[in-house]
A protein has these predicted regions:
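Short, linear, compositionally biased motifs with a strong N-terminal bias
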Residues: 12-15
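Short beta-strand segments that buttress and anchor functional surface loops
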Residues: 201-206
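Flexible low-complexity loop/turn motifs enriched in small/helix-breaking residues
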Residues: 24-198
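Bacterial N-terminal signal peptides that target proteins for export
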Residues: 1-9
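C-terminal motif of bacterial Sec signal peptides marking the signal peptidase cleavage site
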Residues: 17-20
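Short beta-strand edge/turn micro-motifs at domain boundaries
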Residues: 208-234
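Secreted/luminal cysteine- and crosslink-motif detector
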Residues: 22, 195, 232-234
Length: 234
């Protein structure tokens, strides 16, 4: 009986494990697939991380070249997919990102206060506080949820459904889009140091902000981000 119960538990755990590792990339048109890219793995391509310690400056520069690198999306300069994770806040894991600030970094469509008034009114009914202006002329942005999920899967192996902090975000099932207010400030990470150990890879900028990465199945994923206390003074 114990053996049978053990086998059942094993099967259940196996199903859960497979399900957790087999998240499908959302269907995207070509221009959005190109936007998602894979800046982490591209940056580390050809870089030897087999030994613990600090990487050479030349390797760090190669990796850092993919950070804070504007992307031309249909003729508009936007934040690239990797940089969407950096908006001036720390997170202990990707599930802890502030979804509103993360989403507001994406390529988006701006709603017109006059032409889209009826739509805006409907969105505000869902979440009256989410679309309050934090400053004059702040814009309401519409962002494709599939694009958000694709970036999260690429860099963190999660989807936006896994994110816990969904305050100030309105989701519309009708068009599978997120609606958020634009961010008040811009932020960027520019690594100058890369440390390698057996458990993780740590990228630091010049004010000691830390991005930690892990490897799974030969691919790099974001583990956490710690914003330097000095960031407020920069």
């Amino acid at each position: 009986m114990k053996d049978k119960l053990f086998k059942i538990v094993l099967v259940v755990l196996s199903v859960v494990f497979v399900a957790s590792c087999s998240k499908k990339m959302p269907e995207l048109p070509e221009e959005k697939k190109a936007y998602v890219a894979d800046y982490l793995n591209d940056g580390f391509n050809g870089v030897d991380i087999s030994k613990d310690g600090r990487l050479e400056k030349s390797d760090v520069k190669k990796i850092a070249a993919n950070f804070n690198k504007p992307y031309d999306y249909n003729g508009e300069e936007v934040v690239n997919s990797l940089d969407t994770f950096f908006y001036g806040e720390s997170f202990a894991s990707p599930q802890d990102i502030t979804l509103k600030n993360f989403v507001a970094n994406f390529p988006s469509k701006t709603l017109d206060p006059e032409k889209d008034k009826s739509q805006i009114d409907e969105l505000k009914k869902q979440n009256p506080d989410a679309l309050k202006q934090t400053r004059e002329n702040a814009k309401i942005l519409k962002v494709d949820k599939n694009l958000v999920d694709a970036v999260l899967l690429k860099y963190a192996n999660i989807s936006s459904d896994d994110v816990t902090n969904k305050e100030n975000v309105v989701y519309s099932k009708d068009d599978n889009s997120y609606y958020v207010m634009e961010n008040d400030e811009e932020w960027a990470l520019e690594p100058v140091v890369c440390k390698v150990n057996s458990k993780e890879i740590i990228l630091e900028d010049d004010i000691k902000s830390e991005l930690k990465l892990i490897q799974k199945g030969g691919k790099f994923f974001i583990k956490s981000f710690e914003l330097s206390p000095n960031a407020c003074c920069e």
